[in-house]
């Protein structure tokens, strides 16, 4: 997680400990949901923090942007903050890049939350909201995909085993070794996808 993410958790916790006496500006930085804290929206893209803010304000859920793979120390801060909010079970919805690395980050976040040192596997469920080609249709038009897709075969040969494994599951884009950055998606579509997912949990 990024430094800003940890600060948001820490400021939120300090606000709770001091009976909410910190300034409103800092209380608003807390990322733990005010109404449905156990519902967690996750993205790897720090540039989608605006979407996290939308999810939190519109739906009262917990929302975080990790800036890539999340470390166990940051996960511990996050877990502690959720436990202080009396969360015992967690449902996670993830929006990440449509590529091997986005899929891995989403999967690892869900798995880590289910570790026995945190909530335990039986208390965590999660889904990637843009894991398949069919999912992409909710985020992009065909023209946007064509413009935004990138050739994954151009990456280092050391990453090609990851590409092959991911391609075997997803079939890439139209049967080609392509991925796409999720933050290229239209903002309204991203908001609607969060709205759609929240209604299902």
Task: Give the residues covered by each predicted segment.
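Nucleic-acid enzyme cleavage-core boundary/entry regions
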Residues: 1-90, 103-201
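Catalytic metal-binding/acid-base residues of hydrolase active sites
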Residues: 99
């Amino acid at each position: 997680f990024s430094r800003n993410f940890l600060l948001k958790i820490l400021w939120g916790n300090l606000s709770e400990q001091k009976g909410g006496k910190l300034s409103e500006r800092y209380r608003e930085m807390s990322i733990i949901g005010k109404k449905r804290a156990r519902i967690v929206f996750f993205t790897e893209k720090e540039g989608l923090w605006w979407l996290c803010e939308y999810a939190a304000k519109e739906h009262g859920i917990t929302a975080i942007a990790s800036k890539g793979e999340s470390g166990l120390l940051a996960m511990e801060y996050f877990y502690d903050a959720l436990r202080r909010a009396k969360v015992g079970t967690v449902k996670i919805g993830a929006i990440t890049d449509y590529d091997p690395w986005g899929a891995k980050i989403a999967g690892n976040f869900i798995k880590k939350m289910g570790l026995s040192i945190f909530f335990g596997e039986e208390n965590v469920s999660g889904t990637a909201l843009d894991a398949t080609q069919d999912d992409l249709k909710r985020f992009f038009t065909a023209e946007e995909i064509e413009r935004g897709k990138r050739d994954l075969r151009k990456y280092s040969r050391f990453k090609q085993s990851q590409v092959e494994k991911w391609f075997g599951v997803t079939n890439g884009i139209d049967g080609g070794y392509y991925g796409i950055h999720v933050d290229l998606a239209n903002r309204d579509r991203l908001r609607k996808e969060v709205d759609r997912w929240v209604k299902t949990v």
